[in-house]
Amino acid sequence: MINSFESQKVDNDYKIAAFYSFSPIAEKVITTFLSKLRIIAEKHNVRGTVLVALEGINGTICGPVEGVTAMQKQLDSLDLETPLEIKYSYTSRQAFRRFKARRKNEIVTMGVENVDPCKTTGKYVEPEDWNAFLDDPLTLVIDTRNEYEISVGSFDGAVNPRTDSFREFPEWVDKKLHSLLKKKSFKKIALFCTGGIRCEKASALLLREGFPEVHHLHGGILRYLEEVPENESRWNGECFVFDQRVALNHKLMPGVYKLCFACGMPLSPQDQNGKYYIPSIQCHHCVDLFSDDDRERFRERQRHIARLGERFPGNSIWPSA
């Protein structure tokens, strides 16, 4: 299903497309396909990342509208069994520094064998039905994202597995999930993530582990924010995204969070006003992690980026903090 944020186009010259599909892709077509993507990206000033594996494709790209359209035509040439889940948004500046197109073992890395979302996944929950799952006392709602993402925003009552990477999620399932289900006799599990890809793969894992009633939010948080009116929304905070917008508000526009470019952690306005925060140099998360020599390197990096910004104004929003 294609979702469009056409209302954001005013005064925003760059289009962002986030997409994925769990569909089998033949090894013989991957190398040629990636080469064609690189050619299109170079021609049309499209940046971002596209990952392709035997299990499917996953990516986020940003560029002029005509460039993103050209890329999508190439994506469509794969003729996937499961259509791409695509979400669009707009920004006033380029959201990525470069373009990468790579062949990977997994399009989202879980690191567990015999989990195949091409064959088996949980049941989709459409955004308009999600609030009912949040309210259901017999449904355990789980945020499959990482701790630093959840710190920016989440749904009230959702379980936080406190993982630092998606690779840690299977271990959390093995050690914690059974006991959580027994505590309140939950009958269903409902998973969610940013755009749908991690919770879809997580649902395949849970089904393999024998959990019977597994659901996941179709299109993830981003589609929920797009389709559910703000006055009906149960979302709190902002949604962390893996590009230089850092986090999006309910209108799917860049919010108030910035990124510490020393350690990569998201920073709230309160964090940005903290005594340890120096833009692009350090924050309260990393003040004790780096030496004075490190900080001097960060300052030199920032001076270099500033010079590039003077040469190429408006071409990138890196860095923001």
Curated annotation (Swiss-Prot):
It comes from Prochlorococcus marinus (strain SARG / CCMP1375 / SS120). This is tRNA uridine(34) hydroxylase. Keywords: Oxidoreductase, tRNA processing. The active site is at C193. Transmembrane segments: none annotated. It catalyses: uridine(34) in tRNA + AH2 + O2 = 5-hydroxyuridine(34) in tRNA + A + H2O. Residues 135-233 form the Rhodanese domain. Its EC number is 1.14.-.-. Catalyzes oxygen-dependent 5-hydroxyuridine (ho5U) modification at position 34 in tRNAs. GO terms for biological process: tRNA modification. Pfam families: Rhodanese, UPF0176_N. It is an enzyme of class 1 (oxidoreductase). HAMAP family: TrhO. One of its GO terms (molecular function) is oxidoreductase activity, acting on paired donors, with incorporation or reduction of molecular oxygen. Belongs to the TrhO family.
